[in-house]
Design a protein with these regions (language model features):
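N-terminal secretory signal peptides
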Residues: 22-62
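Sec-dependent N-terminal signal peptides of Gram-positive bacterial secreted proteins and lipoproteins
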Residues: 12-14
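Short Cys/His-rich Zn2+-coordinating modules
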Residues: 20-22, 82-83
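Bacterial N-terminal signal peptides that target proteins for export
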Residues: 1-7
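N-terminal signal peptide c-region/cleavage motif recognized by signal peptidases
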Residues: 16-18
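Hydrophobic alpha-helical context, especially transmembrane and signal-peptide helices
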Residues: 7-9, 30
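Compact alpha-helical subdomains of small soluble proteins
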Residues: 48-51, 55-121
């Protein structure tokens, strides 16, 4: 009887851990890296806002769950700082940062960094 209770307790504990596992743990390095790129861009262009703070927290999670070398994330930050957002203007002339960030995360440059990082694994 004691063994049955112990087995039940272990089963429940194991099942509970699986339920609380982060959805990030099932994402590929490519998904995590692209989401990191998007979050990094949002944190950069929306500095000081609540969404920027949330983006930084998301970046930490994406980096934590990724198996890619840390250098890839530093290189991505350098790439972002060297990019030019001037062409992302609405018809009225205002900047469209979010459109830029979406395109940046899916850009060839980010994909090249990802490919390079994967080759270093």
């Amino acid at each position: 009887m004691e063994t049955r209770g112990l087995v039940s307790t272990i089963f429940i504990a194991t099942f509970s851990v699986e339920l609380s596992a982060s959805p990030l743990s099932t994402q590929s390095d490519e998904q995590l890296f692209k989401k990191y790129a998007l979050s990094s861009c949002i944190a950069t262009y929306y500095k000081g806002s609540d969404v920027a703070k949330d983006a930084v927290t998301a970046m930490q999670g994406y980096r934590e769950f990724s198996n890619l070398p840390l250098d890839a994330f530093f290189e991505l930050s350098e790439l972002l700082s060297n990019e030019n957002i001037d062409s992302y203007k609405s018809k009225s002339g205002s900047s469209i940062e979010l459109a830029y960030c979406l395109d940046f995360a899916n850009s060839d440059e980010v994909h090249k960094l990802l490919t390079k990082a994967k080759s270093e694994l």
